[in-house]
Amino acid sequence: MAIEIITGLYIGNKIDSHNTTFLKSRKIKIIINVTTEIQFLKDCENLGIQCIRVPISNNYENYEKQNDEYYYQFRDLCKLIDLKLHQNKNILVHCSSGKCRGSTLILAYLMYKLKKLDHNEIYKILETKYQMVQMDKHVFLDAIRKWNEELKI
């Protein structure tokens, strides 16, 4: 089941992204799908949900390229999340299982908002709220480190 990390921002998995009862009850207006392989719910338009795809693959053979692709999207994605939350639009961020790709974006957003804390401190905060988080240190750690450095400038 998806978890609300901060007011209006949820992390979940592919099942949550297709659960219309959950989407309606939490008033989700934006779904950010951090996968290449999972289709959006067909009723999104009828439910008034905006769908955004962040095409990050589950194939980690070329993880250096994946890190760069993800890192270069962080700023725009964080600004978008911030804008939509300020418009009181609830957001579900998901990947396949909710453990790595989606959690990475949530971590990047929390880093964007809580600039005084480093990524390790924010990861611990995220982990207390969402025990499913399993950041694959070999896959997105470089992107998170770069993002951490950029935010400190």
Task: Indicate where each model-derived feature is located.
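Cysteine-based protein phosphatase catalytic domain of the PTP/DSP
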Residues: 2-91, 111-151
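A phosphate-binding catalytic loop at a beta-strand-loop-alpha-helix junction
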Residues: 89-107
